[in-house]
């Protein structure tokens, strides 16, 4: 549904002009690339494990009639489309920080990730170097790390999806899914806790705590407590600067 709505908006925007419209078009092309990339990673083989003539996904690049039945593209065609959409998006996108919107740096990071899947390491490295050298984002400090996850527009978040108490706050959110007072579906295993104990100086170990879920004790992640204690309200961070490193 998200991809279909995106394509409908993109089709309508093709007849519009202006700087704001160009940025919108850039965001739409970048998001179309991301949607196809996510679908390819779930429903197709990894490029590094098969021939590029193997099956990819059904590409969605235009408004189709209701009785349309698509056929799967090859893996090569799939990744060609992903890279083509990012190439189209980049000159249209803003380089300013835009919380909740994908910008130039977010699209560049997604392209670097796609290049890694294609084992084009030199190209991926070039994109990552540009982001590290020229983008307005900074790595979290140790003091910032623990409290960064329930905040919006943090230094390291290149692209995040906005969630507010009125928009997108759902029980299928990352906060409700992981927290003991929600679904509590992400309790740490004993072997994982043993591994954490080997690294007492790792700040990320502080993101786990013992809690009780319906009478069952467990150790649960504390990343997504939610803004103002609302576990529904967490912005999923799609791209962070640390991933670029």
Model-derived regions: residue spans:
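Short, flexible, mixed-charge acidic loops at enzyme active sites
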Residues: 48-61
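Second-shell loop/turn segments in exported
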Residues: 15-17, 64-75, 98, 113, ...
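Hydrophobic-face positions in mid-chain alpha helices that act as interaction patches
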Residues: 125-241
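Conserved, well-structured interaction surfaces
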Residues: 1-43, 91-95, 229-241
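Short coil/turn linking the two alpha-helices of tandem helical-hairpin repeats
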Residues: 40-47, 97, 117-119
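"A position-specific structural signal for the A-helix of alpha-solenoid helical repeats
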Residues: 24, 31, 38, 103, ...
